[in-house]
Design a protein with these regions (language model features):
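C-terminal motif of bacterial Sec signal peptides marking the signal peptidase cleavage site
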Residues: 5-6
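Short, conserved catalytic or interaction motifs in soluble domains
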Residues: 9
C-alpha cells in the first residue's frame, strides 16, 4: 500500500518508482476525443487518491476494480464530479494493463549463498486450535513469549524454562486477558509501579466490516498477576494498535490509537487523559485525522530536537508514512515522508530503527497485504526510508517478498551492522507449485549500505508477522514468526540462527 533507489538486482521495481506505465494508455492515441476522455477518467479516478496504475492488475481484473471504484463514489454521496462512462473507463485501464502480472519465481531468483541458516526448532511451541496470531513479543527478562490471538481475542504468555532449557518449558500458555478480537498489545508501565501493563487494541470483529464494536483496553500488572481489562474507550471501529504517549506534555499519559476501520469507519484517535487515577483514568476521545486505514503508530524523536514525534502508516487508498513532528504543548507538524506509487501497493507495517547506525532514526516498512485482491504482486516487499537529517529522507527498495506483512531488524550475522528479516502471507501460495514463493527472507547489510537478499523458507506463506530475539541464549539472534492461516498448530514458530558451517555438521 506504500523507484526507490535500488539495492537488489532489479532496482527499478519498487513502490516509489516512477515508470512509463504511469502515462495514460489512452492519450497515446491521436484523436482529440481520446485525450478528452482520458483527462476525464484521470480526474475522476485520481481525485481521492493517486491515479491507479493500469499495470498493477491484469486485464481480466479491471472490470471488478473499476466497478468497485464507482461504487465507492456513490457510497460517499458526493455529487461534485462528472462521472465518466463506466465501460470506457474499463477500456482505459485494460488498454494499459498486461494479460498477466508476472512475479519472479522464488526458486529462480539469483542470490548468493547465505552465511546463515535458520533451523526450525519444534520444541518451542504453544499449540492452538485456530492461532490467527496477530502479534508476538519476546520478553528477555522473563524468557517469555507474549502473543495475541485475533480470532478468540486472547492475550497469552508462554514461558521458557530456566537457563533457556526447553525441556522445562510449559506446553501450555497462561491467559493474561481476553478482549474483543484483540489485535496488538503494547507493553508499558502505565501506572509506574514497576510491573508490566498492556494497552490493547481490540478489533471488535474477526471479519472486516464497518461497525462500532472496537475498543481500547488497559490491563494492569501486579505482584499477584494481571487485573481484568479496563475499557478506556469503546464504540470505536477496528482498533489495531494503542500506544501510551503524553501528547500535550501535561504530565498525564494519553493514548494514540490506530483505528483502522474499513471503508466508512476508522480514524487516527487520541484518548486525552483528563484526570482521575492512573488505575482509572478519565479519557476524552478526540479524532486527530478522520481518514480510515491507519495500520500502526510508533513514537520516537526522529529529527533529534529533543521532542517526541509520532509516525503513522496509512493503508487503504492512501499508502503513506506520515510523520508528526512534535513542537511541544500538543502541537505537531505533519509531513508525508513516504508515499507509495499506487493505491494497490498495500502498506502493511513499519518500524522505526537506526538501520545504518549513523545516529539518526530511519523507517523500515513492508507492503504486501494480499487479503483484499488475493493477487501476487511484483511490487510487494521491503523498503527503507533513510533519515538524512534536517528532515530530509532518502528512499531505498530492499527487495521483493510477495505478501510481505512485517519485518524485524537485528544483527543476524554478528558482523556489527543491522540486517532485516521479513515474513509473507499469501493464502493462494498453497495452490502453486513448490518453490513459487518465499515465505521468509532476510537481507544481509553490507559495508556499502547495500542489502543482499537471502531466502529462509519457501511455500508456507502463512505468517502475520515476526520478531528477532536470542531465544536459546547462544548470543545469536533467532527468529520468531507467528502463524495466521493454519489451524491446530503452534501460535508461533521459532527458527534458531546457526552459521552454515555449524548447521551442516
Amino acid at each position: 500500500m506504500l523507484g526507490l533507489i535500488g539495492c537488489d538486482s532489479s532496482p527499478s521495481v519498487g513502490p516509489l518508482a516512477t515508470t512509463k506505465s504511469r502515462m495514460s494508455p489512452v492519450r497515446e492515441n491521436q484523436t482529440e476525443q481520446s485525450k478528452v476522455l482520458a483527462a476525464k477518467i484521470e480526474r475522476f479516478c485520481g481525485d481521492c487518491h493517486k491515479m491507479p496504475d493500469p499495470t498493477t492488475f491484469p486485464k481480466s481484473r479491471w472490470p471488478e476494480e473499476v466497478i468497485q471504484g464507482f461504487n465507492f463514489y456513490v457510497d460517499s454521496q458526493r455529487t461534485d464530479m462528472e462521472e465518466p462512462d463506466r465501460l470506457e473507463t474499463i477500456k482505459y485501464f485494460q488498454a494499459g494493463a498486461p494479460d498477466h502480472v508476472d512475479v519472479p519465481r522464488a526458486d529462480q531468483m539469483e542470490q548468493p549463498p547465505s552465511p546463515l541458516r535458520f533451523v526450525l526448532d519444534e520444541r518451542y511451541q504453544a499449540k492452538m486450535e485456530s492461532p490467527s496470531t496477530a502479534q508476538v513479543q519476546w520478553d528477555q527478562a522473563t524468557k517469555s513469549i507474549f502473543f495475541s490471538n485475533m480470532r478468540d481475542g486472547e492475550l497469552r504468555q508462554w514461558s521458557l524454562g530456566s537457563e533457556q532449557n526447553t525441556s522445562e518449558a510449559s506446553p501450555e500458555s497462561k491467559l493474561i486477558a481476553t478482549g474483543s478480537h484483540t489485535c496488538r498489545a503494547t507493553k508499558c508501565d502505565w501506572n509506574q509501579d514497576g510491573f508490566d501493563d498492556f494497552l490493547i487494541g481490540e478489533m471488535g470483529s474477526f471479519p472486516v466490516g464497518d461497525h462500532e464494536k472496537g475498543r481500547i483496553s488497559l490491563v494492569l500488572g501486579t505482584a499477584q498477576g494481571y487485573l481484568p481489562p479496563k475499557i478506556l474507550q469503546d464504540k470505536l471501529s477496528r482498533v489495531v494498535e494503542a500506544r501510551p504517549f503524553d501528547y500535550d506534555d501535561d504530565g498525564r499519559m494519553d493514548v494514540l490509537a490506530a483505528d483502522f476501520g474499513w471503508r466508512t469507519t476508522g480514524a487516527l484517535r487520541l484518548l486525552k487523559n483528563m484526570g482521575g487515577s492512573a488505575e482509572s483514568p478519565q479519557m476524552e476521545s478526540i479524532i486527530l485525522d478522520p481518514r480510515h486505514g491507519p495500520v500502526g503508530i510508533d513514537i520516537a524523536d526522529l529529527d533529534g530536537d529533543g521532542k517526541q514525534d509520532f509516525l503513522v502508516g496509512y493503508g487503504q487508498e492512501f499508502e503513506t508514512l506520515e510523520l508528526h513532528y512534535g513542537q511541544g504543548q500538543g502541537k505537531y507538524q505533519r509531513e508525508i515522508v513516504a508515499s507509495l506509487a499506487d493505491p494497490s501497493y498495500n502498506l502493511s507495517a513499519f518500524q522505526i530503527v537506526d538501520l545504518d547506525q549513523d545516529g539518526k532514526l530511519d523507517i523500515v516498512y513492508t507492503c504486501g497485504d494480499t487479503m483484499d485482491a488475493l493477487l501476487a504482486k511484483p511490487y510487494h516487499g521491503v523498503g527503507w526510508v533513510r533519515n538524512l537529517g534536517e528532515r530530509k529522507w532518502e528512499h531505498r527498495w530492499l527487495g521483493l517478498l510477495v505478501g510481505a506483512l512485517a519485518s524485524s531488524t537485528a544483527d543476524l550475522d554478528g558482523d556489527g551492522d543491522l540486517d532485516v528479516v521479513a515474513v509473507g502471507m499469501f493464502p493462494k501460495a498453497k495452490d502453486e507449485p513448490e518453490g513459487t514463493f518465499d515465505s521468509i527472507c532476510w537481507w544481509e547489510q553490507t559495508p556499502d549500505l547495500n542489502f543482499v537478499r537471502h531466502s529462509i523458507e519457501r511455500d508456507r506463506c502463512t505468517y502475520a508477522s515476526c520478531t528477532t530475539a536470542d531465544v536459546n541464549g547462544d548470543g545469536r539472534q533467532d527468529l520468531i514468526v507467528w502463524e495466521w492461516l493454519i489451524p491446530n498448530v503452534s501460535a508461533f514458530r521459532v527458527y534458531l540462527n546457526q552459521p552454515v558451517a555449524e548447521s551442516t555438521r
